[in-house]
């Protein structure tokens, strides 16, 4: 067996990686006899022994072999599955903080058990991250019997849980959770006004399932907590009708490119399909201004503050019409415009594009235009997971991105060989000039295969293409199923039958990841169809046993026909997505076949490889309607994909450089929040901040007279309190500072005595945190604007990142000062009297939403009410007709109670 482990490995690095694990694997195999003799009740006792050893100073490495042996035997007893040697090797790599690449059907979920169990013994918690709630719940329930036998607790966090349940689940030894929920919980924890309401504990160790999807595909989509904001939604309707009046700039007839010189551009705007960007020309802005004025939408110049937003509205309208298409980037359902994930093919329920793009698409599709949102907190997945002491991951496709994993995350990829040799035949790509010829060829190939009885899976890049092929199959009399975002409710049924004889399935990327297509069909699904769901577990197991003979007959028949035939209808930008589609065939040593059909009209070819391939095909003597299959062409396609992957890597690296600036600032703000939450003497903190600010204002006076700037500032801070000093212009600056500090301390002491120390400290904490949150939200918006501004400076040969870092630091320094000053001003100017001795701050619940944001300025909004993100009320609620706490003299309902 040990020799067989090495033989299938590809490449010298893989062999070296595997060779390093063999001595440990041998020792684990030798220990298996010891574990076999244990009674069930001994497992939890052995776990306690291992925990005691760790507390006594032993290391995880010294107990690793016993822990892996125990968990392997626990899996055999509870799941009737003994982890293969390759799965043990995978577990060892996961423990070391590496990424394992395992092919479909090789048991990644079971491979994670050993590493999770070992690392849970420290008591610091293990997080296992999945891509959706279904997998989190499924995997936790599936592995729970194993962990129960071992005596470690296991939990799961789902999107519908409140914070009390979340906190309880995160406290377990091992917790399953989605990447989105983990990120949102981190952001929500850092918006809380009570330490006891925080859900998470310190980030220790996490195992990320489908790590390439989360850390690469979703790396351009930062998580965001947002709240509603008022916006001019009518403007999107107004500009939507103007799209046809503006014209794209003319391109060179030979090269297909725009003129290099700006003065030579003839038209209103240019389109960058690769970056999904629209740019107005000077002529275009003039035409837009005339258009808006003639339609009565604006009056006067486009460049006034009140009118210039229409450039943004129009840009988004053009994007909506020219770069985002129905049944490709999104669908229109009962709930309006719904985004389709380009990598998974699934609907991103409740999420919205940002920056007005979603509103522009809604206007285009003539559905209700919703309000925009404002950012309250944000983090990228890169920086979320870099906070863990140790991370590792699993996927079927990681080796193509090994360079990025190493450079960004310092993670190595270990390619784990299959337990059985891969028998799938991967054929050279077949290439056509046009999409029409390609689709006809696919239909012919599927028809022949269908008649033979061999199951076929046809992968498409969009809903639109899946519907075109479906119509063509229908015309040829090919019975088939279509799996896309529009009929996802039938997914389980379609996938269960996709490996049966004569099965033909057209699917978007939904079938490319996480689906297990079994030859002959799915026996459990077949039994459910026969006996229904209203039966006992014993009856179901008996029915499965009785059906097994028929199933094995069907399995062997499909196997003899060549297994599952996977046809890709075009190449994706990423080789990983293509490999995921191919990976549906040839599971666990089964036979299979795969081939990609490509045309020069496909997006990848058109944008990244069209000219070179067209030239090469011409040299090979290819006519318009003829296909061609050649290793040179396949190599050219792969090179095009590599160029796109390198480009996307640079984009993600670029995003990370920007986000690192925000990360340092966010970490500082969150550390300040935590310090304030724990502080029992915030009055002293505020007085120290005031003294520092006064010293800053008095720098350079050297004890002389004060400046007008200083006088203006202290008037804003102290207001009515300065009356006792009389004329202050001639007071020595140092004496004035001492007097002001004396006034401030007396002011705060009086209020503290009036309502009590604890209550006053709670009020000060609330005011400080409220100021931090509000100002930081404004700061995030300012950073977004700054980023747009520095992007344009690249045209002036300036480095945008350097400019962003330098100016970002300056506005952050201003933010810190502003938070302190506004808090000082607020608490000093608050008037309390004896009639409001039971004054308390108002607990305000915030209507916030969780969002996702794509690199190209696209923000995806997960539109759900996060009720557990709230400001904590530290005092009883003020009556609506009572005087407002701000001292304005107005009733609360007519002042701060309006909102």
UniProtKB/Swiss-Prot annotation:
It holds the Pfam family SEC-C. One of its GO terms (molecular function) is metal ion binding. It is found in: Cell inner membrane; Cytoplasm. It is a peripheral membrane protein. GO terms for cellular component: cell envelope Sec protein transport complex; cytosol; plasma membrane. Zn(2+) binds at residues 884, 886, 895-896. The keyword NADP does not apply. It catalyses: ATP + H2O + cellular proteinSide 1 = ADP + phosphate + cellular proteinSide 2. Its main location: membrane. PROSITE patterns: SECA (PS01312), SECA_MOTOR_DEAD (PS51196). ATP binds at residues 87, 105-109, 516. This is Protein translocase subunit SecA. It comes from Borrelia garinii subsp. bavariensis (strain ATCC BAA-2496 / DSM 23469 / PBi).
């Amino acid at each position: 067996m040990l020799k067989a482990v090495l033989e299938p490995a590809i490449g010298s690095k893989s062999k070296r990686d595997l060779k390093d694990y063999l001595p440990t694997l041998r020792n684990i195999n030798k220990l298996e006899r010891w574990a076999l003799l244990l009674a069930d009740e001994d497992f939890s006792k052995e776990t306690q022994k291992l925990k005691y050893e760790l507390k006594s100073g032993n290391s995880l490495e010294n107990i690793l072999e016993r822990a892996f042996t125990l968990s392997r035997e626990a899996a055999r007893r509870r799941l009737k599955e003994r982890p293969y040697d390759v799965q043990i090797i995978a577990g060892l790599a996961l423990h070391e903080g590496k990424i394992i690449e395992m092919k479909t059907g090789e048991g990644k979920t079971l491979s994670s058990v050993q590493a999770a169990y070992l690392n849970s013994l420290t008591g610091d918690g293990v997080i296992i991250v999945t891509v959706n709630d279904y997998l989190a719940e499924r995997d936790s329930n599936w592995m729970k019997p194993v962990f129960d036998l071992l005596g470690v607790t296991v939990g799961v966090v789902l999107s519908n849980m409140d914070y009390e349940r979340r906190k309880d689940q995160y406290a377990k030894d091992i917790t399953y959770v989605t990447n989105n929920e983990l990120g949102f919980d981190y952001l929500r924890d850092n918006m809380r006004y009570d330490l006891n309401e925080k859900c998470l504990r310190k980030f220790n160790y996490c195992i990320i399932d489908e790590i390439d999807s989360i850390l690469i595909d979703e790396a351009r989509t930062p998580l965001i907590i947002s709240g509603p904001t008022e916006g001019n939604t009518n403007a999107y309707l107004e500009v939507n009708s103007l799209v046809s009046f503006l014209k794209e700039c003319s391109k060179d007839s030979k090269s297909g490119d725009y003129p290099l010189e700006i003065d030579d551009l003839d038209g209103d705007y240019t389109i960058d399909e690769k970056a999904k960007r629209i740019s107005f020309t000077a002529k275009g802005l003039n035409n837009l201004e005339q258009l808006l004025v003639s339609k009565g939408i604006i009056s006067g110049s486009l460049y006034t503050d009140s009118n210039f937003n229409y450039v943004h509205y129009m840009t988004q309208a053009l994007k909506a019409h020219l770069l985002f298409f129905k049944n490709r980037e999104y669908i229109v359902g009962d709930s309006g415009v719904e985004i389709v994930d380009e990598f998974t093919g699934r609907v991103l329920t409740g999420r919205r594009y940002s920056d007005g793009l979603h509103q522009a698409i809604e206007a285009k599709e003539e559905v209700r235009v919703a309000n925009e949102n404002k950012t309250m907190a944000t983090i990228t997945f890169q920086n979320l997971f870099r906070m863990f002491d140790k991370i590792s991951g699993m996927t079927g496709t990681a080796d193509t991105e090994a360079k990025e994993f190493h450079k960004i995350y310092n993670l190595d990829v270990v390619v784990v060989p299959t337990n059985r040799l891969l028998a799938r035949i991967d054929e050279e790509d077949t290439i056509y000039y046009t999409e029409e010829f390609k689709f006809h060829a696919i239909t012919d190939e599927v028809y022949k295969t269908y008649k033979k009885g061999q199951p076929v899976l046809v992968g498409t890049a969009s809903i639109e293409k899946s519907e075109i092929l479906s119509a063509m199959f229908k015309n040829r009399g090919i019975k088939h199923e279509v799996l896309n975002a529009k009929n996802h409710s039938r997914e389980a049924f379609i996938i269960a039958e996709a490996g049966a004889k004569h099965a033909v399935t057209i699917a978007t990327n939904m079938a490319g990841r996480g689906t297990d297509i079994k030859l002959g069909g799915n026996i459990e699904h077949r039994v459910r169809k026969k006996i229904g769901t209203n039966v006992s577990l014993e009856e179901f197991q008996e029915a499965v046993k009785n059906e097994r003979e028929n199933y094995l007959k069907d399995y062997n028949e499909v196997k003899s026909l060549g297994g599952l035939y996977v046809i890709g209808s075009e190449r994706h930008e990423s080789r990983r997505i293509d490999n995921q589609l191919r990976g549906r065939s040839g599971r666990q040593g089964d036979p299979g076949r795969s081939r990609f059909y490509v045309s020069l009209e496909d997006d990848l070819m058109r944008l990244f490889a069209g000219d070179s391939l067209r030239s090469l095909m011409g040299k090979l003597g290819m006519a318009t309607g003829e296909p061609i299959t050649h290793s040179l062409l396949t190599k050219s396609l792969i090179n095009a994909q590599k160029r796109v992957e390198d480009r996307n890597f640079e984009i993600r690296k670029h995003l990370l450089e920007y986000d690192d600036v925000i990360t340092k600032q966010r970490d500082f703000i969150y550390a300040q929040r935590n310090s304030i939450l724990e502080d029992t003497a915030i009055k002293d903190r505020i007085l120290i901040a005031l003294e520092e600010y006064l010293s800053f204002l008095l720098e350079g006076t050297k004890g002389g007279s004060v400046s007008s700037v200083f006088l203006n500032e202290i008037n804003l801070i102290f207001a009515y309190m300065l009356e006792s000093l009389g004329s202050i212009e001639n007071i020595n600056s140092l004496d004035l500072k001492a007097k002001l500090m004396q006034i401030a301390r007396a002011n705060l002491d009086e209020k503290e005595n009036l309502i009590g120390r604890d209550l006053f400290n709670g009020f000060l904490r609330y005011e400080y945190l409220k100021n931090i949150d509000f100002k930081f939200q404004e700061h995030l918006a300012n950073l977004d604007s700054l980023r747009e501004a520095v992007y344009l400076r690249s045209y002036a040969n300036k480095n945008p990142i350097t400019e962003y870092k330098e100016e970002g630091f300056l506005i952050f320094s201003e933010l810190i000062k502003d938070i302190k000053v506004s808090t000082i001003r607020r608490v000093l100017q608050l008037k309390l009297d004896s009639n409001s001795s039971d004054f308390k701050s108002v607990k305000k619940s915030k209507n916030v939403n969780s969002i996702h944001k794509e690199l190209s300025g696209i923000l995806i909004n997960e539109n759900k009410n996060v009720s557990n993100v709230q400001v904590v009320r530290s005092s009883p609620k003020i009556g609506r007709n009572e005087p407002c706490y701000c001292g304005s003299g107005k009733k609360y309902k007519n002042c701060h109670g309006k909102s």
